[in-house]
Amino acid sequence: ITPEMTTTEIDAIVHRNLLEIGPVAGMNNHEGSLITESKVKIGKVIEICQKQGIFFLDSRTTAATAAPQAALELGAQIWERDVFLDNTQNRADILEQLQRGVEVANRKGYAIMIGHVWSGGNLAQIMEELYPVLKAQGYSFSTVGGLYENFGG
């Protein structure tokens, strides 16, 4: 989806993609800052998710996201990421973000943390190291689809 697309084009491409990919639990905007800043355009995506019975996750790639307002006006529930883990590849920064995620989880029962585990950076290694530690402390890991089923689906 690109910013110059009309809502009719957005509707067509999202439906075509859903048919091509097959059953999905939900979708998110990965690099969709410009789309999420448009309440009309992101509203079309959220409306499709609502009608399909799938979740929408706002990755919050921009502070100017209109997704929450669009969802509110549609009466739709969306998910929003709480923490972006690897905005930098610096190990200390990633660990700090992970700690922020733990604090969010302690506060609200879960935290949606996103990152790039496949990108060759430090995140995959850090997660591999800390997974058993966090599990031993009582934390569990889930997909967003799993959260949707347990907390909001």
Residue ranges, per PLM feature:
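Alpha-helical scaffold elements lining the catalytic groove of polysaccharide deacetylases
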Residues: 1-19, 36-41, 68-105
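C-terminal transmembrane helix-loop-helix hairpin of multi-pass membrane proteins
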Residues: 101-104, 108, 115-119, 123, ...
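Sec-exported extracytoplasmic/periplasmic mature domains
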Residues: 18-26, 47-54, 72, 103-106, ...
